[in-house]
Amino acid sequence: MARFISKRKDGKDKDKDKKANRPLFKRRKFCRFTAEGIKTVDYKDIELLKDFINENGKIIPARITGTKSRYQRQLSTAVERARFLALLPYTDLH
């Protein structure tokens, strides 16, 4: 019995395309604040805040960092306060 192979219009195999787009290893996300036992996020801890800000100066979303929603809210207010006091830049141009 012949096996039917699914092909696209351009002749490439669909299954190979799916495997090629899949990442090799996906890191498990965890809340860094819970793991380190941090109760509140401090706006004066610049080294910690820089880990959650991308190169453009935007706050990285919780779905990417794995931060719990409680700490993500604290993180965003801490970044806003640090920006207001000129401890962190608003954008990458400053």
Curated annotation (Swiss-Prot):
| Keyword vocabulary terms for this entry | Ribonucleoprotein, Ribosomal protein, RNA-binding, rRNA-binding
Which InterPro entries does the protein's record reference? Answer: Ribosomal_bS18, Ribosomal_bS18_CS, Ribosomal_bS18_sf
Gene3D superfamilies in the record: Ribosomal protein S18
Ranges of biased composition (kind: Basic and acidic residues)? 7-20
Ranges for the region named Disordered are 1-21
Q: Where are the transmembrane segments?
A: none
- A Gene Ontology molecular function term of the record: small ribosomal subunit rRNA binding
Q: Can you cite an annotated GO cellular component?
A: cytosolic small ribosomal subunit
Q: Superkingdom, according to UniProt? A: Bacteria
The chain's coiled-coil residues are: none
Could you mention a single GO BP entry for this protein? translation
Record-linked HAMAP family: Ribosomal_bS18
Q: What does this protein do?
A: Binds as a heterodimer with protein bS6 to the central domain of the 16S rRNA, where it helps stabilize the platform of the 30S subunit.
UniProt similarity note = Belongs to the bacterial ribosomal protein bS18 family.
**Subunit structure and binding partners:** Part of the 30S ribosomal subunit. Forms a tight heterodimer with protein bS6.
- NCBIfam families recorded: S18
Q: What is this protein called?
A: Small ribosomal subunit protein bS18
The organism named in the record is Nitrosospira multiformis (strain ATCC 25196 / NCIMB 11849 / C 71)
